[in-house]
Swiss-Prot record:
Pfam families: Aim21. Involved in mitochondrial migration along actin filaments. Residues 79-89, 136-147, 308-319 have a biased composition (Low complexity). Residues 1-99, 114-171, 209-400, 414-457, 490-537 are annotated as: Disordered. Keywords: Cytoplasm, Cytoskeleton. Residues 514-527 have a biased composition (Basic residues). It is found in: Cytoplasm, Cytoskeleton, Actin patch. Residues 19-33, 54-67, 337-350, 414-429, 490-499 have a biased composition (Polar residues). This is Altered inheritance of mitochondria protein 21. It comes from the Eukaryota. Residues 217-234, 351-378, 430-457 have a biased composition (Basic and acidic residues). It comes from Vanderwaltozyma polyspora (strain ATCC 22028 / DSM 70294 / BCRC 21397 / CBS 2163 / NBRC 10782 / NRRL Y-8283 / UCD 57-17) (Kluyveromyces polysporus). Belongs to the AIM21 family.
């Protein structure tokens, strides 16, 4: 390849300060023609942000990049002296000092008739204060006047010009005087309206109380006073009559404490009628309902008198409640306008009225209770006859299996009970009796085992016979009898044959039976390196330690006869001397040691035989050959048994 064909790899582009250098770059340019740009200038100090409203943002070349020096930034100037604080109440205090004389002249003009009620005047140094209790009733005209005047004064203070300082000092006192005069007059008229309203409510209360006094019945008052006259010292009417005077006194005291003056002039105001109470309607409805309810008399002579007395009492109590409700309603309007002293008086009046009502109702309730007791005494109550209990349910008869199971349990319980009774101390029973009991138990157990075996065999034969004809066997043909060979096999075995086989099997020894070895994976042997390892036998003349079993415990089931023998041996041993039991002769110990060593050697010889057999291949080959021979013999037997079936099928096919 020539040098012209080799592509030129351009260098990595570098960042430039402006866009002008980017426009001059062309991709086809060679690496030699590229010029490295100059590095940017890094400022030594952090730039300070300038205000956006400055005029030199576009003119200075340095500001275009957003960098400014410390010399161009102008710092704010800190004043040397702290500004003086001006108070807003100084001018008002000056105006108040100049208006005290004018206020005294206004009071003299207003209170010509009663010079004693004039205010004593204020000192020059005192500042007017706001009253503690705000007047509740205020007229719309006075509030609007005071608001407009105060707004005018505020506007005059705010609209201040430096050129009008001399004129402003003259105008302000005049405006402030007018506002104070108007406010003072409005307060005096408000106090007059409050006093007039209170007097009107008091007059209305006196009228309603006087009317109620005429309606109260003398009979009811006599009954109430005779019951508990010591509780009430004065009637409720007198307490209610004293309320208006106490209300007026308290209001006059409040007015004097606030520094305000009350006027005794009266204004005529229309009377406000009382709202009709709902209690009257409810009480009238309740009385009508009580009168309409019929009462069934037991004795006609006595019950009529009781009914007449109760009806009169109910009517009198309803009228009393109506009158007292009217009195409470008339006083409630006055009590709402009063102060804390009025509330206390009202609560006292309510307590007195409730006590009087409770005293009036107590004798009525007692008499009504007596009337109910009289009626209940004369009504006979017949108790209900107790219901007879039905006959007990008849228990269901248990099924045959349950009955047999219950009998079996009862028999077992009886046997256990008899065995417990037979367990008497040996001193009372003889050894011959105990042996007889043991023989009886053995015979019973053997008989039960025989019966169970016979039952199981009989059930099996029945089950096999019931399956005849259901499943097709190899030698069976449809719609024909079974062959003779199958009938012999399927026939029920006789009891004699079963017993003979049992005797034969019982005579065989268990030791002659071949025990099968657990088969493992075939064809797998140990590796040659492991199998060829020679055992090392250390033949040292040093002493050797042998570990063997010194004693052994065998647990076997014990029959009752054996238990009796054991108990007798224990008793005989206890009677013997303790020393003779504990001492063991040397001959016995030697015999035990020799027997234990022989057992240990036998155990070790068996282990070595097993290991040698596993390592030898000849033993495995012999076992394999024996298994193959046994399988061949079994196949021959099966074929010999199937020959009669083949003859039958061949005869059928030929025929």
């Amino acid at each position: 390849m020539s040098e012209e064909d080799i592509p030129i790899i351009p260098s990595r582009p570098k960042k430039r300060a402006t866009d002008s250098s980017l426009s001059s770059y062309t991709p086809n340019a060679s690496a030699d023609n590229l010029i490295s740009p100059s590095p940017p200038i890094i400022p030594t100090s952090r730039p300070l942000s300038r205000a956006k409203t400055t005029d030199n943002i576009n003119t200075d070349p340095v500001t275009t990049t957003g960098i400014a020096t410390k010399e161009e930034v102008e710092l704010p100037k800190v004043p040397t002296n702290r500004p003086t604080r001006r108070t807003t109440t100084q001018e008002l205090n000056d105006l108040i000092d100049n208006t005290n004389h004018e206020l005294e002249e206004i009071e003299a003009m207003v209170f010509k008739d009663d010079p004693n009620k004039m205010s004593t005047g204020t000192n020059d140094d005192d500042i007017p204060h706001v009253p503690g209790n705000r007047p509740k009733i205020t007229s719309k005209t006075t509030t609007t006047i005071t608001k407009e005047s105060l707004n005018d004064s505020d506007a005059a203070i705010n609209n201040k010009n430096p050129s009008d300082e001399q004129t402003d000092s003259k105008v302000r006192p005049e405006v402030f005087k007018e506002n104070l005069n108007e406010a003072k007059i409005a307060k005096t008229y408000d106090i007059m309206d409050m006093n007039n309203d209170i007097k009107e409510f008091v007059d209305n209360g006196n009228k309603t109380l006087s009317e109620n006094e005429d309606t109260v019945s003398t009979e009811h008052l006599d009954k109430v006073t005779t019951s508990d006259a010591s509780r009430v010292d004065e009637p409720p009417d007198t307490t209610l009559m004293k309320e208006p005077n106490t209300i007026l006194d308290s209001e006059e005291v409040l007015a004097s404490n606030d520094g305000q003056v009350s006027i005794n002039e009266k204004e005529i105001t229309p009377t406000i009628p009382n709202r009709p109470s709902r209690k009257k309607e409810e009480q009238s409805e309740s009385t009508s309902n009580v009168e309409s309810t019929p009462v069934i008399p037991v004795r006609p002579a006595k019950v009529k008198e009781i009914q007449s007395e109760s009806s009169t009492r109910l009517e009198s109590s309803s009228s009393d409640e109506q009158e007292k409700a009217n009195m409470v309603d008339s006083v409630s309007a006055v009590a709402e306008r009063s102060t804390n002293s009025k509330d206390q008086i009202y609560t006292n009046s309510e307590r007195a009225s409730k006590e009087s009502l409770s005293e009036a109702k107590e004798p009525e309730i007692e008499k009504n209770d007596n009337q109910v007791h009289i009626e209940t005494k004369h009504i006979p109550v017949i108790p209900e006859r107790p219901k007879k209990n039905g006959p007990p349910p008849i228990p269901k008869k248990p099924s045959s299996r349950i009955a047999a199971f219950q009998k079996m349990i009862q028999e077992q319980q009886a046997q256990s009970f008899n065995s417990l009774a037979s367990d008497v101390p040996t001193s009372e029973r003889t050894i011959s009796e105990i042996e007889k009991d043991g023989d009886k138990l053995k015979t019973e157990q053997t008989m039960e085992e025989k019966n169970q075996i016979n039952r199981s065999n009989a059930e099996r034969t029945k089950f096999a016979s019931s399956l005849n004809g259901l499943f097709a066997l190899p030698g069976m043909a449809p719609l024909q009898n079974l062959p003779a060979a199958l009938t012999k096999k399927l026939s029920q075995p006789s009891e004699s044959g079963f017993n003979d086989s049992k005797e034969v099997n019982g005579g065989e020894n268990i030791s002659n039976i071949r025990q099968k070895r657990a088969r493992g994976p075939r064809g797998r042997k140990l590796p040659s390196k492991v199998a060829a390892v020679e055992k090392v036998n250390d033949s040292n003349n040093s002493n050797e330690i042998e570990v063997f079993r010194a004693w052994r415990i065998d647990s076997k089931p014990v029959t009752p006869s054996e238990e009796i023998v054991i108990t007798q041996n224990q008793l005989s041993d206890k009677q013997s001397v303790i020393s003779s039991e504990d001492i063991i002769t040397e001959s016995e110990t030697d015999k035990q040691i020799t027997s234990s060593t022989e057992e240990f050697h036998k155990y070790t010889e068996q282990e070595t035989d097993i290991t040698d057999r596993n390592q030898d291949v000849t033993a495995e080959v012999l076992e394999h050959d024996i298994e193959v021979q046994i399988e061949k013999e079994m196949e021959e037997q099966i074929l010999a048994e199937d020959e009669p079936y083949e003859e039958v099928f061949s005869a059928e096919t030929i025929g």
